Amino acid sequence: MNRFPINHCRVCGKTVVYRLPDDGDTKPRAVCTVCHTVHYENPLNVVGTIPTWGEDGSKILLCKRNIEPRWGKWTLPAGFMELNETTAEGAARETVEEAGAQFEMQGLFTLMNVAKVGQVHLFYRAKLLSDNFDPGSETIEARLFTEAEIPWDEIAFRTVRETLKLYFEDRQTAKFGFHVVDIE
């Protein structure tokens, strides 16, 4: 079950109970005790980019977080997808909000299943058009790093660390694939 359980019906406001719905579902769901509405708890999508700089894509733009969790740690520009936007639109929006970067979107690079916390992380490759950045309020600093310069011990999230490792592996062959990773 969700670590933030549903307590009240979104339709009528009455109390819900977790049980198997009458429709044959095999998982306990939040079911309203009055109007019998079934409430489903679904994963959240986190979307972002791997912004690269240079003809060879040897530098990566990272943002130092100015928010919790993991304040002061480095991450790729990313955040929760909003309603009414595609994954690519959300990734682009987050990159502008967090880094103030100008870039060209490229292909989807990683899909990370983080089932333990009910999230799916998607990262797109992006080619920076400028090395001037205007970080937003969620970012202390936006900076370019080569692979050797990346502060690996200061990376905020495992999904970001794994995405960066896969990027640099693919970069060596100049063939960028699409990677699906399950994070335990």
Please report, for each region that a protein language model flagged, where it lies by residue.
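Unchanged
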Residues: 81-166, 170, 174-176, 183-184
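Conserved hydrophobic/aromatic beta-strand scaffold that supports enzyme active sites
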Residues: 8-11, 29, 50, 62, ...
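Short connector loops at helix/strand junctions that flank enzyme active sites
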Residues: 27, 42-46, 69-71, 76, ...
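Conserved Nudix-box catalytic region and its N-terminal flanking loop in Nudix hydrolases
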Residues: 42, 53-97
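A generic fold-level signal
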Residues: 4, 44, 55, 69, ...
